[in-house]
Structures are given as structure tokens and as C-alpha cells.
Amino acid sequence: ITTVGLKRLAVATLFACGIVHAQSTVPVMQPTEGDFEARDFHFQSGQTLPTVKLHYATLGTPTRGADGKVNNAVLLLHGTTGTGRAYLTPLMQKELFAAGQPLDASRYYIIMPDGIGRGGSSKPSDALRANFPRYGYNDVVEGHYRLLTEGLKVDHLRLVLGTSMG
């Protein structure tokens, strides 16, 4: 290795250490996670399940207006093959949820559900396999609606934001 090669290696090492340090100093927010069981779930295919588990993660705290209703809820929807945890990377937390950012978790109640068929929500591979009802996007939307209104008692959203099919 030449002197020039050693200098380049030293600069690259310092640069890499700086990136690792910068990423490690981002405060990581711990979400609250939960499951809601939607009872007597009717799929658009005409099939019904006695319960459908809908998994979710939240950041922030719900606040209620004078009418007692949650008034700071935001719904973030993942893409077709993702989960709600897609929004919980250190970079997303820093750019979206940190103090002063667009979805500051100290101001908003951020809800990140797993759609039917994904993550911790009910899906064919849980047990029913081929006997799991045929489901589509309308069923996923119905699941989100029931999670919000029945499970989390949220009937108004400040924002709905998604990636891809979210």
C-alpha cells in the first residue's frame, strides 16, 4: 500500500465512522404495539371469519377535543408487501416524527397498522392456509376502518398517508 492509498483508506474509515456515529445519535422512538380483534369480519368475497386480528403500532398520544373525540390522529399505510413498521426506521423517525418535523410525535397520534395478510395481522399462513377467505384491498380498508373506529375509538383523521398501494 502506498502513502496515497493509506491516506485514502484513513479518509474512508473516518467517513464511515462519521456515518455510523450520525445514525447512532438519532433518538429511537419506541412505538406502542397492539392487536385488535375485529369480530364477525365479513369479506367482500362473501366469506366470514369469527375474528380477524389487526396488528398496529402507534407513536404519540391521542388528544381529545371538548367533544371527547380524538383530534390529532394520523394514519400511515404501508405498501402492498410491507408492514406498519416500515415507518419506524431511524431515518424516518428523524425526518418525520422528531420534534419540529411534519409529523412530530409530540403533537400527533400516529397509527401504523399492518393490513390483513401482512405482518402481525391475520393472514393465510397463520393456520387456515387455502381456507383463509379470499381478500382484496377493500377488505384491507375495512380492517383499517374497524381498527380505527372500534379498536382505537378514532373517527376523524388529520391525515392519511401511504406508500405504494398504501
Regions found by a protein language model. Name each.
Residues 127-140:
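Catalytic nucleophile-loop/oxyanion-hole region of alpha/beta-hydrolase
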Residues 1-10:
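Bacterial N-terminal signal peptides that target proteins for export
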Residues 138-158:
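Conserved acidic catalytic loop of the alpha/beta-hydrolase fold
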Residues 160-162:
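Short beta-strand immediately N-terminal to the catalytic nucleophile in serine-hydrolase-like folds
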Residues 13-22:
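Hydrophobic h-region of N-terminal signal peptides that target proteins for export
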Residues 164-166:
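Active-site loop->helix "elbow" adjoining a glycine-rich segment at hydrolase catalytic centers
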Residues 57-126:
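N-terminal cap/lid subdomain of alpha/beta-hydrolase-fold enzymes
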Residues 22-73, 84-85, 90:
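Catalytic-loop region of hydrolases
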